[in-house]
Swiss-Prot record:
A Pfam entry, by short name: ACR_tran
Organism listed in the record: Escherichia coli O17:K52:H18 (strain UMN026 / ExPEC)
Keywords for this protein: Cell inner membrane, Cell membrane, Membrane, Transmembrane, Transmembrane helix, Transport
Family per record: Belongs to the resistance-nodulation-cell division (RND) (TC 2.A.6) family. MdtC subfamily.
InterPro entries: AcrB_DN_DC_subdom, Acrflvin-R, Multidrug-R_MdtC
Task performed by this protein: The MdtABC tripartite complex confers resistance against novobiocin and deoxycholate.
Protein's UniProt name: Multidrug resistance protein MdtC
Keyword check for Acetylation: no
SUPFAM superfamilies reported for this sequence: Multidrug efflux transporter AcrB pore domain, PN1, PN2, PC1 and PC2 subdomains (SSF82693), Multidrug efflux transporter AcrB TolC docking domain, DN and DC subdomains (SSF82714), Multidrug efflux transporter AcrB transmembrane domain (SSF82866)
Any one GO molecular-function label of the UniProt entry: xenobiotic transmembrane transporter activity
Subcellular location: Cell inner membrane
Main location: membrane
Length: 1025
């Protein structure tokens, strides 16, 4: 009593307290960062190593395995995968959430150092690492194009000047440059000319290496001067290399230009990048795991004018893709939804109270509660994101509930003739415990979420804390500011209402009278009502089991990623043509705004595309509908497949794949894995629940297998090293010398001129100089035949692995796909030596599925404990919780009606309903208990009177919550995929709950009262609490 009086009789202090809360919230709002979702990125580090010319199997055994053994001993590694291809290995380390990325990086460097002695000596550089997830979509893609500069020169500008500067920007984790390679002097040898001159490829390599040497020469001094010695020991351009003497034949000089074509070119000619049909260099920028995407993008944009000044004017630097516009648009949509929710909630209050003066009170309480929450969000290190803003949108209906309960009860006393200040004090005292019970039990719902681990726990924590803080501030405001305003603003008389609102008042009275009559019938047919309640419980179980489920709603971020997978024996030239064909198909689609792509590198049969769609208001289709339309056109391209997927704000795991979800096969028997993977993949491709099924196992690449006749080699004076060196010199794009420039280092690359390697007969033109100086053709001591060989070798942990990727067809859920895969694996009878498990997002979905029911039960148990403590009763909390089954049925039926799968967002809605719908029961039970204690009424009379007396606030609070969530259902535009499931769940649950709990709660109350009396030692005592 004294607590409430302190604020009611000190209006200035109460107002200033509210102003202080609001000002703190405004300051917090201005400092909050912006993000699409809460920070849920796993710490990921990528380790890269190269050994030019080494086969995938050699890279896996000699490079990947030693590194994996060393890296696998690092604490906190939750997953380690590797992929080895021609000349390169990449190892992805995913760490636990609580592992600091910088500390993990230090451990990774130490592990690399420890494994260094076990790695091949021919590696051109030590393994390196990057603190970025290569499977994440770039947050920004920059392109460089020019009509005057070559691709190699553009790549040089990008890698030498732009990439290092961008990498230093806060939040940037990795800048990957693609589309070409660094400039180089390429030496294309003519094997027939070499044979005629009696010059071996090793002779050429040695001559070039010896002619381009950068060594210190020292200095000369006399008594007064000092001269530094400088020589012309370096060759820098193709023109300088052409006259180089590499051999003398019969006294005549053999120059490099006589036996080779020397050009200024690039290190690796098997790279290509394009943007909108124009050759381009791509800078793909990825953020650090803990970085804020909006802040990072803004920092990059601010740096672009300075970057443009560092490159020639003839080079066009453009932003080809930017993830931030759709994120900003999505947040703007949520903010608009929040404003609409506040307006609708206040409208509901006005319609029920029919007084502008009374409506002002909750109209003030709601903004104070919501704005004050921003201060707590800032102190907790949260961001303004879709989930936290949705929490505030839903909180609109919650925070007004407390004010409504207090206001309505005070207004009831005023209408009875009580003085305003006395009515404020008496009314607040009567419902103070009720409001406290409602708020604490609602916050209790989120305690299990706060204790939940893993990615779902991280994802939902900001939502739960934000909503809990808003409810806490609302509780404070409703017990301080609201009664004070009622006491000083409302009059001790029945408020005058406008004529146009009298009809609503009469309708509400008629509705209340009708409810009273139907409630009497329900209380006289308790068994029938009880059967209905039991039926809703059974229906809940059936609906939850049968409803399609997924991890997170599929988002339309306006960005697509595409992975090209061509025939494993395809040449680079043909692959570049496939890239151009696919890009043209994509570019011609009316919903596409920009297309960039690249191919080449160690995997010549693959490529990547990044597609920016037009804004939502300029297209009528969703991203998935566009993918479905393009899939039909892309299927007509022979010899290659382009797999498209919509970029999501949440992607788990470090695997780069061509689809959204992964299923990984593991085995310690590589032969068994290679035998069963094609069978499993073909089976999964036939399932209607899956689309775009593909695999990263590529073991059918074309190979030319050379078999040495060692006896003949010994007789001819040739060793294996010389033969292998010949092949590497001829076909390996061997880097044989380094050109040092002020800004970078460039290579001299030697190979047989591609004009002479168009078919297998090129091997017949190769020869080796034996120990007697004679030229011995390769065909004399070697035979060759075509064979198949892997293009890549993949590991997970230290086991051989193959990952099958898949997308979901329209109308199918992740639970459908998971069940179908499990059935297929059982039908195939896969041996125990091959183990299958879901990976990435699909793995997290499986884990979340297993914990959802436990989480809901934990929330109900927590609410029961809190209510039991508040009511000092084991029974009354059960009465209050009996409202939940009807809400669950309504939520699940609504999801089915809108064809929306049960996702993590829908789970949030269920958790919220646990907190919302019990408010009705709390108001009924509180007043019934009070009537029994002080009114000497029977339980049936007490609960009947409580239901009628609290009918108006029950309708007000329910409609306020419903209208607060309704804009989420009706919202469109960016980010609506996240908002709609939450709104659908809450609105459906509230409608069904309101229809049933007004009858089931009184019946359950009477049932437990009779049960209590039956087992009570004092059966004549009406109330035992």
């Amino acid at each position: 009593m004294k607590f409430f009086a302190l604020f009611i009789y000190r209006p200035v202090a109460t107002i200033l307290l509210s102003v202080a809360i609001t000002l703190c919230g405004i300051l917090g709002f201005r400092m909050l960062p912006v993000a699409p979702l809460p920070q849920v990125d796993f710490p990921v580090i990528m380790v890269s190593a190269s050994l030019p010319g080494a086969s995938p199997e050699t890279m896996a055994s000699s490079v990947a395995t030693p590194l994996e053994r060393s890296l696998g001993r690092i604490a906190g590694v939750s997953e380690m995968t590797s992929s080895s291809s021609l000349g390169s290995t990449r190892i992805i380390l995913q760490f636990d959430f609580d592992r600091d990325i910088n500390g993990a990086a230090r451990d990774v460097q130490a592990a690399i150092n420890a494994a260094q002695s076990l790695l091949p000596s021919g590696m051109p550089s030590r393994p390196t690492y990057r603190k970025a997830n290569p499977s994440d979509a770039p947050i920004m893609i920059l392109t460089l194009t020019s009509d005057t500069y070559s691709q190699g020169e553009l790549y040089d500008f990008a890698s030498t000047q732009l990439a290092p500067t961008i990498s230093q920007i806060d939040g940037v984790g990795d800048v990957d440059v693609g589309g070409s390679s660094l400039p180089a002097v390429r030496v294309g040898l003519n094997p027939q000319a070499l044979f005629n001159q009696g010059v071996s490829l090793d002779d050429v390599r040695t001559a070039i290496s010896n002619a381009n040497v950068r060594k210190p020469q020292g200095a000369l001094e006399d008594g007064t001067h000092r001269w530094q010695i400088q020589t012309n020991d370096e060759l820098k351009t193709a023109a300088e290399y052409q006259p180089l003497i590499i051999h003398y034949n019969n006294g005549g000089a053999v120059r490099l230009g006589d036996v080779a074509t020397v050009t200024d070119s690039v290190q690796d000619v098997r790279n290509a990048g394009m943007t909108n049909a124009k050759p381009a260099i791509l800078l793909m920028i990825r953020k650090l795991p803990e970085a804020n995407i909006i802040q990072t993008v803004d920092s990059i944009r601010a740096k672009l004018p300075e970057l443009q000044e560092t490159i020639p004017a003839a080079i066009d630097l453009q932003i080809a893709q930017d993830r931030s516009p759709t994120i900003r648009a999505s947040l703007e949509e949520v903010e608009q939804t929040l404003i609409i929710s506040v307006a609708l909630v206040i409208l509901v209050v006005f319609l029920f109270l029919r007084s502008g003066r009374a409506t002002i009170i909750p109209a003030v309480a709601v903004p104070v509660s919501l704005i004050g929450t921003f201060a707590a969000m800032y102190l907790c290190g949260f961001s303004l994101n879709n989930l936290s803003l949705m929490a505030l949108t839903i909180a609109t209906g919650f925070v007004v509930d407390d004010a409504i309960v207090v206001l309505e009860n005070i207004a009831r006393h005023l209408e009875a003739g009580m003085k305003p200040l006395q009515a404020a004090l008496q009314g607040t005292r009567e419902v103070g415990f009720t409001v406290l019970s409602m708020s604490l039990s609602l916050v209790a719902v989120f305690l299990p979420l706060l204790l939940m681990g893993g990615l779902p726990g991280r994802l939902l924590r900001e939502f739960a804390v934000t909503l809990s803080v808003a409810i806490g501030i609302s509780l404070l405001v409703s017990l301080t500011l609201t009664p004070m305003m009622c006491g000083w603003m409302l009059k001790a008389s029945k408020p005058r209402e406008q004529k146009r609102l009298r009809g609503f008042g009469r309708m509400l009275v008629a509705l209340q009278q009708g409810y009273g009559k139907s409630l009497k019938w329900g209380l006289n047919h308790t068994r029938l009502v009880g059967v209905v309640l039991l039926g809703t419980i059974a229906l809940n179980i059936w609906l939850y089991i049968s409803i399609p489920k997924t991890f997170f709603p599929e988002q339309d971020t306006g960005v697509l990623m595409g992975g090209i997978q061509a025939d494993q024996s395809i040449s680079f030239q043909a692959m570049r043509g496939k890239l151009q064909d696919f890009m043209k198909i994509i570019r011609d689609d009316p919903a596409v705004d920009n297309v960039t792509g690249f191919t080449g590198g160690s995997r010549v049969n693959s490529g990547m595309m990044f597609i920016t769609l037009k804004p939502h208001d300029e297209r009528s289709e969703t991203a998935q509908q566009i993918i479905d339309r393009l899939r039909v056109k892309l299927a007509k391209e022979p010899g290659a497949n382009l797999f498209l997927m919509a970029v999501q704000d949440i992607r788990v795991g470090g695997r780069q794949s061509n689809a959204s979800y992964q299923y990984t096969l593991l085995s310690d028997d590589l032969a068994a894995l290679r035998e069963w993977e094609p069978k499993i993949r073909k089976k999964l491709a036939t399932l209607p629940e899956l689309a775009d099924v593909n695999s990263d196992q590529q073991d059918n690449g074309a190979e030319m297998n050379l078999v040495y006749d060692r006896d003949t080699m010994a007789r001819l004076g040739i060793d294996v090293q010389a033969a292998n060196s010949l092949l590497n010199n001829a076909f390996g794009q061997r880097q044989i010398s380094t050109i040092y420039q002020p800004m970078n280092q460039y290579k001299v690359v030697m190979e047989v001129d591609p004009r002479y390697t168009q078919d297998i007969s090129a091997l017949e033109k190769m020869f080796v100089i034996n120990n007697e100086g004679k030229a011995i053709p390769l065909s004399y001591f070697a035979k060759w035949q075509p064979a198949n060989a892997p293009l890549s070798v993949n590991h997970q942990g230290l086991s051989a692995a193959s990952t099958i990727s898949f997308n979901l067809p329209t109308g199918k859920s992740l639970s459908d796909a998971s069940a179908a895969i499990d059935r297929a694996m059982t039908q195939l009878g896969v041996p125990s030596t091959v183990r299958g498990s879901f990976a990435g997002t699909a793995q997290v979905f499986q884990e979340t599925m297993n914990s959802q029911v436990i989480l809901i039960i934990a929330a109900i148990a927590t609410v029961y404990i809190v209510l039991g403590i508040l009511y000092e009763s084991y029974v009354h909390p059960l009465t209050i919780l009996s409202t939940l089954p009807s809400a669950g049925v309504g939520a699940l039926l609504a999801l089915e009606l809108f064809n929306a799968p049960f996702s993590l967002i829908a789970l949030i809605g269920i958790m919220l309903l646990i907190g919302i719908v019990k408010k009705n029961a709390i108001m009924m039970v509180d007043f019934a208990l009070e009537a029994q204690r002080h009114g000497n009424l029977t339980p049936q009379e007490a609960i009947f009177q409580a239901c009628l007396l609290r009918f108006r606030p029950i309708m007000m609070t329910t409609l306020a919550a419903l209208f607060g969530a309704l804009p989420l259902v009706l919202s469109g535009g960016d980010g609506s995929e996240l908002r709609q499931p939450l709104g659908i769940t809450i609105v459906g649950g509230l409608v069904m709950s309101q229809l049933l709990t007004l009858y089931t709660t009184p019946v359950v109350y009477l049932f437990f009262d009779r049960l209590r009396l039956r087992f009570s030692r004092k059966p004549k005592q009406t109330v035992t609490e």
